[in-house]
Amino acid sequence: MKRPCEETTSESDMDETIDVGSENNYSGQSTSSVIRLNSPTTTSQIMARKKRRGIIEKRRRDRINNSLSELRRLVPTAFEKQGSAKLEKAEILQMTVDHLKMLQATGGKGYFDAHALAMDFMSIGFRECLTEVARYLSSVEGLDSSDPLRVRLVSHLSTCATQREAAAMTSSMAHHHHPLHPHHWAAAFHHLPAALLQPNGLHASESTPCRLSTTSEVPPAHGSALLTATFAHADSALRMPSTGSVAPCVPPLSTSLLSLSATVHAAAAAATAAAHSFPLSFAGAFPMLPPNAAAAVAAATAISPPLSVSATSSPQQTSSGTNNKPYRPWGTEVGAF
C-alpha cells in the first residue's frame, strides 16, 4: 500500500509517494521507511521546491511591474502625472481603463494615429516646461505669484500652449478630412500668401503677384524656387510697415501665431508627401522639412518678437545693462504682448 507524503504542495508535478510496506511485514521494514522519510535527500528536495517557488513568485512580480511601467509610459494621462508623484498600481490601472474607454468612445481612432499621439505628447511636454518655468521663477528668481512679470510670462506661455493645441487640432482635422493626393502640394501653397497677408490689411491686388500657380501653369521643376520666393515675400510683408499708417503693421499674436503655425505645418506635410510622389530634386532650392522641424519653426516664430517690439525694447535693455541687472530678454518681450 502507498500513502502520500504529508509534505505536499500545490504543484502537481512535485507530488511524491513513499512506499511504507505492507501491514503484515515485520516492524523492521516500517522503521526503515520512517528513516527514509526523514532522510537528508527528502529534506533537500523540500528546500529545492521552496526555492523554486520563490523564484517563480519573483518572476511573476517582475512581469507585473514591467507591464505596469509600460502602461504608465503608454497612457498619456499617467505619463503626465509620473513626474509629480509616484503613481500606485491601482491608479495606473484606472487610468488605463479610462484611456481604453476613451478609445472605444472615439471609435478606436484616437491615439492609434501617430500624428495625434505625437501632438498630444508635445502638448504635455510644453505644459511640463510651463510648470518648471513657474517653479524656477518662484524658487530661484524669488518672484511670487502676484509679481507682474511672472504673471505676464506665465500668461504668455499659457496662451502659446493653447494656440499650439488649437493649431494642432485644426491641422489634424484637415489631415483626416483632406488626404493628400499627388498634386496636393501646389494646392496647399496656393493660398499661403493671402492667409499670411490678410491680417496686415493689404488689398487683394497687392497680394496677387506673389500667388502660386497650379501645376498646370508652372512646371514642377520650378516649384521649389517659387515656394522659397513665396516664403520670403510673406516674411518681408509681415515685417514691413504699411505706408499709410505707422500703427499695427504686425498682426496680434493670437492670430499670427495660429495661422503661421498651421500653414507651416501643412506646408511641411505637403512637401514631404511631394517628395514621395514626384521624382524631383529639392536639394538646391527648398529643403525638406520633417514634421518636428515644422514644430520647431512655429516655436521659434512664437518666441521671436516683431520688429517694432525689438526696436522699442532695445533702449530698455541698454539701460538695464548700465544698472548691472541680470539680462532678461523675455521680460520686455512679454510686456509688449
Swiss-Prot record:
Keyword Repressor: yes
Region span, Transcriptional repression and interaction with NCOR1 and SIN3A: 47-116
Composition bias, Polar residues: 22-46, 307-325
Primary localization class, coarse: nucleus
Composition bias, Acidic residues: 8-18
Keywords: Developmental protein, DNA-binding, Notch signaling pathway, Nucleus, Repressor, Transcription, Transcription regulation
GO CC, any one term: cytoplasm
Region (Disordered): 1-52, 307-337
Residue ranges constituting the bHLH domain according to the UniProt record: 48-103
GO biological process: anterior/posterior axis specification; aortic valve morphogenesis; arterial endothelial cell differentiation; ascending aorta morphogenesis; atrial septum morphogenesis; cardiac conduction system development; cardiac epithelial to mesenchymal transition; cardiac left ventricle morphogenesis
Location within or outside the cell: Nucleus
Residue ranges constituting the Orange domain according to the UniProt record: 122-157
The organism's place on the tree of life at top rank: Eukaryota
Chain positions of motif YRPW motif: 327-330
PROSITE patterns for this protein: BHLH (PS50888), ORANGE (PS51054)
MF (Gene Ontology): cis-regulatory region sequence-specific DNA binding; DNA-binding transcription factor activity; DNA-binding transcription factor activity, RNA polymerase II-specific; DNA-binding transcription repressor activity, RNA polymerase II-specific; histone deacetylase binding; identical protein binding; protein dimerization activity; RNA polymerase II cis-regulatory region sequence-specific DNA binding
Known partners and oligomeric status: May self-associate. Interacts with GATA4, HES1 and HEYL. Interacts with HDAC1, NCOR1 and SIN3A. Interacts with ARNT and GATA6.
Family according to the record: Belongs to the HEY family.
Functional note: Downstream effector of Notch signaling which may be required for cardiovascular development. Transcriptional repressor which binds preferentially to the canonical E box sequence 5'-CACGTG-3'. Represses transcription by the cardiac transcriptional activators GATA4 and GATA6.
The name this protein goes by in its record: Hairy/enhancer-of-split related with YRPW motif protein 2
Organism: Homo sapiens (Human)
Highest classification ranks of the organism: Eukaryota, Metazoa, Chordata, Craniata, Vertebrata
